[in-house]
A protein has these predicted regions:
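N-terminal localization/anchoring segments of enzymes in phospholipid and broader phosphate metabolism
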Residues: 1-534, 552, 556, 568-686
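Glycine/threonine-rich ATP-lid/beta-loop region of ATP-binding domains
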Residues: 544-547, 551
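Hydrophobic alpha/beta core scaffold segments
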Residues: 559-563
Length: 686
């Protein structure tokens, strides 16, 4: 494909993060939600530097571009990233200052160490002595030969100690802010009807004279700094070590990964900045980014809600109508398929299904894939209870789920101690598909049932992620799920099991080929002047071969509607592509579902999937796209996607210029798809 025919993946991702920033800028969004979006933006950007920028740096270091699916030279991509990130940083600061003004209108004040009254000063000093002092160990930078490795999840106060009469030479010190052990936000004693909040680092700033009292200085200044490190885990080819040992080694090495970004308060003492850059071995190529006074904004996702007079609680999830007044979820699933739509439907149904299986005397085994689990997972509880009740339980645990590796290693130990058979994935491929297979024997007859999901089996993320979960006892679907588990148990000996799947599209075995065939069928229909359409709901679209096929379909006249939240590399604005409509929706819930609908000559084919249309998902992961057979569920998915395509409040047009222009309501009824979807599903449940 000509490189001019797609948008650069990393630049497209930055455009997505700009949409998150738009939500923070939107004054119709509740104030606490606006702060949450600033936190999400910050967290997203941290991960982007840890992963994508780090990867580009690696490629430059080894002079590699070939076969890495890049649209242009990595050095040029990095230059464009730097330019856009600096633009976003300025917009971030503007929005933050606007939010601070709005907070003041609500009598909420984020105060620093210089704005405290006497009562607050005493409170802060006492709080420091009682809660913080024992967690603070300052480092005198000139006194240490080997500079410490700065954690990329921490923030640090870089301090300048000086004497007003200049009788003592100034010194530099470093204080780690213990925000992972202590609350970042501290509510201060305040006047009636006012709320004053101070940040943990500002409490430490206030107490710098006490921390450094024995050095004889009387003037102290400080600035927040932060580093971001390469988060890639290198898994070597040493056959003498297990995958677990390699991951454990990789996690240790990650803490010392190469610095890919250094962010600092732009008001920092110039000599201190120069000293830090030198001691850290940085250069201007290492993304030195000036920022504001506050860093690690991701903590603002959890800004205390109690300070707001007006609360904006999320709508509570509700029970699927088919499960109302039902004593056992299992009985209904054995009769018909049920589609759970999170976060609107309650995730408790999934937990109930596993709990029922754990105590059902007819159930003999449970198999499940686990990618990211909740911190206090009820799924794990159900699985361990099943073992206690004599069931054979198998959990496929993906140890390489990025940033969840340590948690999954801990889950592995807990599950194995309980007697669960743990499979730690497939060599060289992540298991990203989400399945559960429950086997019961009734009157010597084997019955298989379970679920296929677009998202993680995680009760925490199910409250804020938009996903679909198909509960089913369909024999064809469950036969394929069984085949996939057979493969996962012995991947090197059973590769034929993936290829044997008859209803589920599985990557890397056949998904690419099958998707190409489905698109080609629409192309053939369009060329024959027949109705032809494709509707896609994805997180990301960057696979060049699939994009090329979509271009071919668009040229042939296939109507293509796309809802893509994140990366979108397809160019849509072309006179020959009149039938292409692409939007991105960013709102209160994270749109995480993947759905594909092909007209198929009037016999529509509808799939829910764990896979985005990216090379990594199609060729290098275990992924699954599951067909939806029942007409009422097909219609429900079509209705939900149509509601989203009609969104004119939170939808942005995905255009060639990455402008993120909102869809124009044009005096029609205002449609906010997440609210409309809630109403649509809730009405069904009444």
């Amino acid at each position: 494909m000509s490189k001019q025919k797609i948008i650069i993946r990393d630049i497209s991702w930055l455009s997505f993060n700009s949409r998150v920033l738009q939500e923070a800028a939107d004054d119709t969004v509740p104030l606490r939600e606006r702060m949450r979006f600033l936190g999400i933006f910050s967290n997203n950007l941290d991960e982007f530097f840890r992963v994508r920028v780090a990867t580009l740096n690696r490629m430059i270091a080894i002079g590699q571009k070939k076969n890495m699916h890049l649209e242009m030279n990595p050095s040029l991509i990095l230059e464009e990233i730097q330019e856009k990130v600096l633009e976003q940083q300025k917009e971030f600061e503007r929005i933050w200052n606007e939010i601070l003004r709005e907070l003041k209108k609500q009598k909420i004040f984020l105060v620093n160490e210089n704005k405290l009254n006497r009562i607050q000063q005493r409170f802060v000093q006492d709080y420091f002595n009682e809660e913080i002092r024992s967690n603070v160990v300052p480092l005198m930078m000139e006194s240490i030969r080997e500079f410490p490795t700065l954690s990329d999840k921490s923030i640090y106060l870089a301090c300048t100690l000086s004497k007003k009469d200049k009788s003592i030479a100034k010194k530099f010190a470093l204080v780690s802010v213990p925000a992972r052990r202590l609350p970042r936000f501290i509510i201060l004693p305040s006047k009636q009807n006012e709320k004053h909040i101070i940040l943990l680092e500002d409490v430490i700033r206030f107490c710098l004279p006490h921390i450094f009292s024995f050095f004889g200085y009387d003037s102290f200044s400080s600035a927040i700094i932060k580093v971001t490190r390469d988060a890639e885990i290198d898994i070597d080819n040493d056959v003498s070590t297990s995958l677990i040992q390699k991951i454990e080694k990789g996690l240790k090495n990650r803490k010392k990964g190469k610095t890919v970004r250094f962010v600092y308060d732009k008001e920092i003492d110039a000599s201190l900045l120069a000293y830090l850059v030198k001691r850290l071995g940085l250069s201007h190529k290492d993304n030195l980014i000036p920022g504001g006074r506050i860093h690690n904004f991701k903590d603002f996702i959890d800004f205390p809600e109690s300070v707001f007079v007006k609360k904006n609680p999320r709508k509570k999830p509700f029970l699927h109508p088919a499960l109302k007044n039902v004593s056992r979820t299992t009985d209904i699933i054995l009769q018909k398929d049920i589609l759970l739509n999170f976060p609107y439907h309650s995730f408790d149904t999934v937990i109930d299904l596993l709990r029922e299986a754990a105590i059902d005397p007819e159930v003999v085994s449970i198999k499940i894939t686990c990618y990211r689990l909740a911190s206090r997972s009820k799924i794990i509880n159900a699985l361990t209870n099943a073992v206690r009740n004599g069931k054979q339980v198998t959990a496929v645990l993906e140890l390489r789920a990025r940033f969840d590796e340590e948690a999954n290693l801990e889950w592995k130990e807990e599950l194995e101690e309980a007697g669960v058979k743990v499979i730690i994935g497939v060599p060289e491929m992540k298991v990203h598909a989400k399945f559960c297979l429950i086997k019961k024997i009734v009157q010597n007859k084997i019955i298989l049932y379970g679920f296929v999901s677009t998202g993680n089996i995680n009760e925490q993320t199910a409250k804020i992620y938009g996903d679909h979960c198909l509960l089913t006892a369909n024999k064809n679907i469950m036969a394929d799920v069984s085949r996939i588990f057979h493969y996962l148990e012995l991947p090197k000996m059973r590769p034929h099991f993936l290829k044997a799947c008859k209803t589920i599209m599985v990557s890397p075995a056949a998904m690419r080929k099958q998707l190409m065939q489905l698109i080609q069928k629409e192309i053939t229909a369009a060329k024959a002047k027949k109705t032809a359409s494709i509707t896609l709901k994805l997180n990301s679209l960057s696979d060049e071969l699939l994009i090329e096929k979509l271009y071919e379909a668009a040229k042939a006249g296939v109507v293509i509607n796309m809802i893509v939240r994140g990366i979108f590399c397809m160019l849509t604005e072309n006179l020959k592509f009149k039938e292409v409509y692409a939007i991105s929706i960013v709102d209160e819930y994270l749109e995480h579902a993947r759905v594909m609908i092909f007209h198929n000559g009037g016999k529509e084919k509808v799939f829910i999937s764990s896979a985005d249309w990216m090379v990594r998902n199609i060729d290098h992961r275990i992924e699954a796209a599951c067909p939806v057979f029942e007409k009422n569920i097909q219609q429900e998915l079509k209705d939900i996607l149509q509601i989203q395509l009609n969104d004119n409040i939170k939808a942005r047009i995905l255009d060639n210029e990455l402008s993120n222009q909102y869809v124009n309501p044009r005096n029609t009824k205002k449609i906010r798809s997440q609210l409309e979807t809630y109403n649509y599903l809730h009405k069904k449940s009444i």
